């Protein structure tokens, strides 16, 4: 198997899942390089000087290009490989503008709420830190208000930018998936009690590219917990070949 020029440095946070999801929608071969973000591996001098001076993941390397920030990575992949795999960018300028608008909504309205809940309910417990119950309750209430707006929008079209799945939808699923995997039934009810939102989430969760992403994400979690290889894939990722060496995983999408 030839070495892939494309590398994705990633770890256990939702922006990494969005980048993985996008690559899998495109069906691109790449090397996944595990970075234990929670253990500070993104803060080393080498990482800061060669990959991302802000010490965050994901980071994409494609030839001589290095990109950080999830939306910059997915936008590049969607444009550079527009004719490969799933088209994630509407061709119509107005629809593309609507897509961009909902990506901004994600950044400014949805993600700050979701990230706080993920931090309090998943990351803090993993690190042995206390959960701020007040912050959790406040952000559940904020999430309910935001999801009411999404429910209205998704009653007008099956996806945020219109009739087709796009980057706007892609970026929402990763944090939603984290929220659905907490022990908070109230969070699940906030999503599934809204029929349009629920249908949107379930359609995205059944996409083959997302099913691959979940398997990869689970193995990132295994790496984080166990820090040992080799990794053995289960049958749900049968369309991808994974070869692991140290913290690097070469992915061939077929």
From Swiss-Prot:
Alphabetized InterPro entries for the sequence: Glutathione-S-Trfase_C-like, Glutathione-S-Trfase_C_sf, Glutathione_S-Trfase, Glutathione_S-Trfase_N, GST_C, GST_Phi_C, Thioredoxin-like_sf
GO molecular function list: glutathione transferase activity
Residues of the GST C-terminal domain: 92-231
Residues the entry annotates as binding glutathione: 42-43, 56-57, 69-70
A biological process term (GO) from this entry: toxin catabolic process
Presence of the UniProt keyword Cytoplasm in the record: yes
Annotated GST N-terminal domain residues: 4-85
EC number of this enzyme: 2.5.1.18
Subcellular location(s) of the protein: Cytoplasm, Cytosol
UniProt protein name: Glutathione S-transferase F14
Organism, scientific name: Arabidopsis thaliana
